[in-house]
């Protein structure tokens, strides 16, 4: 007689315990997420609709500011061929990315922000807090006086009242929450008919003020500018100037102009720019009125580059963007700089890798606080 077949019922799996954080009050969850570094927000947004909505809400950034957990973030204005409209990207930093080791690279990359509309070419891009002001430029091949405000917390844009005058290619700098728009072209040619006025926008009162522009390099185009100690350092093909916007005084600086500085940034009152011809990072100290070369990372950056962009970053660092001459790749490096005994400035490459592939051109880099 055959043995009976015994069929065992499958064991019931215990139900998944509820996520503890989902049991907490909403305000507690907001306070917890506000303390999480932003590099983890893309991962959090994939957990649930609740988290996706939370990390995109203005409230989370208000709490980050309240707790002192804000971070500096980089937004990059990019054109496809230097003739099309501007599209905005942000530098996305992967958590726990590998540090630069000579052969391996981290997974940092430039990510397109699709919710922002195209912006005018060759305008002014100024970051204040969590916002970016976009002023003037070319729109449909016409000079525009339009002003837009980008809210980097929500990646939305709104239109503000126009500038008093339409210009492109101006010198634009921020001093004491006032945006100085100096010169620029009022025709389709960047080299002709430079504007002879200076427009000042008070971001607190939201009012424009027109000032007569001194006859600095009449008929010339300004190529680069930075702010050091409340003064604007500007360069044309022929001269470099140090200008005080309060009394409109302007003095030539022949030592500063001895190098073809371009797309510079400032860290601790020292000007930095990357010399693509000599493949080196140069530093200008206005107190000593002397140029130097940053040491310590020779051979660690791409060579044969056709352009560079630098932007200052938190904690005594700068971010450098490079494009190699024969490749359609944008490289990015984060470099920590320090002044050592004897006055020499040394740099350390924290990481360096390709962040965007394709025939793109970086028009400007803007740092905001989120």
UniProtKB/Swiss-Prot annotation:
The keyword Repeat applies. Component of SCF(ASK-cullin-F-box) E3 ubiquitin ligase complexes, which may mediate the ubiquitination and subsequent proteasomal degradation of target proteins. SUPFAM superfamilies: F-box domain, Kelch motif. GO terms for cellular component: nucleus. Keywords: Kelch repeat, Nucleus, Repeat, Ubl conjugation pathway. Pathway: Protein modification; protein ubiquitination. Kelch repeats lie at residues 131-177, 178-230, 263-315. Gene3D superfamilies: Kelch-type beta propeller. One of its GO terms (biological process) is protein ubiquitination. It holds the Pfam family F-box. Transmembrane segments: none annotated. This is F-box/kelch-repeat protein At4g38940. InterPro entries: F-box-like_dom_sf, F-box/kelch-repeat_ARATH, F-box_dom, Kelch-typ_b-propeller. It comes from Arabidopsis thaliana. Residues 18-64 form the F-box domain. Part of a SCF (ASK-cullin-F-box) protein ligase complex. Interacts with SKP1A/ASK1, SKP1B/ASK2, ASK11, ASK13 and ASK18. It is found in: Nucleus. The F-box is necessary for the interaction with ASK proteins.
């Amino acid at each position: 007689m055959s043995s009976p077949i015994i069929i065992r019922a499958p064991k019931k799996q215990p139900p998944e315990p509820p996520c503890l954080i989902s049991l907490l009050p909403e305000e507690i969850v907001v306070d917890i997420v506000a303390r999480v570094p932003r590099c983890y927000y893309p991962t959090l947004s994939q957990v649930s609709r609740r988290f996706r909505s939370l990390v995109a809400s203005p409230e989370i950034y208000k709490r980050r500011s309240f707790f002192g957990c804000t971070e500096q973030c980089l937004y990059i204005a990019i054109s496809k061929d230097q003739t099309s409209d501007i599209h905005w990207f942000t530098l996305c930093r992967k958590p726990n990315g590998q540090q630069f080791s000579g052969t391996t690279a981290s997974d940092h990359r430039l990510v397109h922000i699709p919710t922002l509309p195209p912006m005018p070419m060759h305008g002014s891009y100024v970051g204040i807090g969590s916002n970016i002001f976009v002023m003037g430029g070319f729109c449909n091949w016409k000079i525009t006086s339009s002003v837009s405000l980008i809210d980097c917390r929500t990646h939305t844009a709104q239109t503000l009242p126009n500038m008093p005058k339409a210009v492109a290619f101006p010198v634009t700098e921020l001093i004491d929450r006032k945006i100085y728009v100096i010169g620029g072209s009022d025709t389709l040619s960047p080299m002709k008919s430079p504007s002879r006025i200076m427009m000042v926008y008070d971001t607190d009162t939201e009012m424009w003020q027109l000032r007569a522009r001194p006859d600095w390099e009449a008929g010339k185009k300004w190529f680069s500018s930075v702010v050091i100690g409340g003064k604007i350092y500007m360069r044309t093909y022929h001269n470099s100037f140090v200008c005080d916007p309060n009394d409109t005084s302007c003095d030539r600086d022949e030592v500063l102009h001895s190098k073809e500085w371009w797309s510079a940034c400032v860290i601790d009152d020292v000007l930095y720019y990357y010399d693509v011809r000599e493949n080196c990072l140069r530093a200008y100290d206005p107190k000593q009125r002397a140029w130097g070369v940053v040491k310590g990372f020779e051979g660690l950056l791409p060579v044969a580059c056709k352009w560079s962009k630098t932007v200052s970053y938190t904690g005594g660092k700068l971010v450098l963007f490079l494009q190699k001459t024969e490749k359609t790749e944008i490289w990015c490096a984060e470099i920590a700089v320090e002044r050592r005994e004897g006055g020499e400035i040394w740099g350390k490459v924290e990481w360096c890798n390709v962040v965007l592939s394709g025939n793109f051109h970086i028009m400007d880099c803007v740092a905001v606080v989120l």
